[in-house]
Swiss-Prot record:
Residues within the DNA-binding region(s): 55-78
Biological process terms in GO annotation: response to stress
GO molecular function: DNA binding; DNA-binding transcription factor activity
Protein function: Transcriptional regulator acting as an intermediary between major regulators SarA and agr and virulence genes. Represses alpha-hemolysin (hla) gene expression.
Subcellular location: Cytoplasm
UniProt feature coiled coil, ranges: none
Name recorded for this polypeptide: HTH-type transcriptional regulator SarT
Cross-referenced InterPro entries: MarR/SlyA-like, SarA/Rot_dom, Transc_reg_Sar_Rot_HTH, WH-like_DNA-bd_sf, WH_DNA-bd_sf
Top-level division of the source organism's lineage: Bacteria
Length: 118
């Protein structure tokens, strides 16, 4: 039983170390936080023809605290990765809008991150 617990602890520590290294790597080479990366990855994976995403869907899918995603979207908007606006039909909803040019930039950036990370 202790052997199984030890192996589980080792796996957990490896994941923590990998996450820590990824955070440092993103910050140093791309000026991104891990939360920024997760939002950009979401936008790439769930790309759609309209380039529109609801903030609540991003928060729900990524599964981390809402305030962290809101902060990340604000940072990414300031850097030009995306635009955000209120839903004209329901002002409580925030819509993330990504142009074709922005999508291409995000896709290239994520490819560069994945190539350099390996």
């Amino acid at each position: 039983m202790n052997d199984l617990k030890s192996k589980s602890n080792i796996k957990l520590m490896k994941r923590v170390l990998t996450t820590y290294e990824l955070r440092k790597y993103l910050k140093k080479y791309f000026c991104l936080t891990l939360d920024n990366y997760l939002v950009l990855a979401y936008l790439d994976v769930f790309k759609n023809d309209e380039g529109k995403y609801f903030m609540r869907d991003i928060i729900s899918y990524i599964g981390i605290d809402q305030s962290r995603i809101v902060k990340s979207v604000k940072e990414l908007s300031k850097k030009g990765y995306l635009n955000k606006c209120r839903d004209p039909h329901d002002s409580r909803n925030v819509i993330i809008v990504v142009s074709v040019k922005q999508h291409n930039y995000i896709k290239n950036l994520l490819s560069e991150i994945n190539i350099n990370e390996t």
